[in-house]
């Protein structure tokens, strides 16, 4: 059962890392169309810090973090910066919702719980309000 739990947590870390890559590259795609657009520039950088936090969890477990399945080209361009902001609201809501069920798990390792809690909080209390203001 222990091996299964470890594998489940590994799959969970992969899923979380891809979720953060997705957010970063979504915002990178907006910056390609609207160079320097705020809040995308700062939040895209923040998403890279989220990726790094998750990559450290892999390293701590002597696992190689996977590369992103996402690129900026994965996303269709937004018609306007306001539409991009609405896309940011949707993405950050999905990000926060992604972490919610996992944070309820009793067997979630403490280091994973801490990172997931921080990433969910960043989505809810920093990124989401910034995108709501720019819609």
Role assignments for model-derived ranges:
Residues 1-135:
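All-alpha RGS (Regulator of G-protein Signaling) helical domain and cognate RGS-like helical scaffolds
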């Amino acid at each position: 059962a222990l091996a299964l739990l470890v594998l489940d947590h590994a799959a969970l870390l992969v899923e979380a890392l891809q979720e953060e890559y997705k957010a970063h590259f979504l915002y990178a795609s907006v910056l390609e169309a609207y160079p320097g657009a705020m809040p995308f520039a700062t939040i895209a950088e923040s998403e890279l810090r989220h990726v790094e936090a998750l990559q450290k969890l892999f390293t701590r477990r002597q696992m190689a973090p996977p590369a992103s399945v996402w690129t900026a080209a994965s996303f269709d361009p937004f018609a306007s910066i306001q539409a991009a902001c609405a896309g940011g609201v949707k993405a950050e809501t999905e990000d926060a919702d992604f972490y919610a069920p996992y944070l309820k798990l009793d067997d979630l390792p403490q280091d994973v719980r801490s990172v997931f809690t921080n990433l969910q909080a960043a989505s809810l209390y920093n990124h989401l309000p910034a995108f709501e203001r720019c819609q």
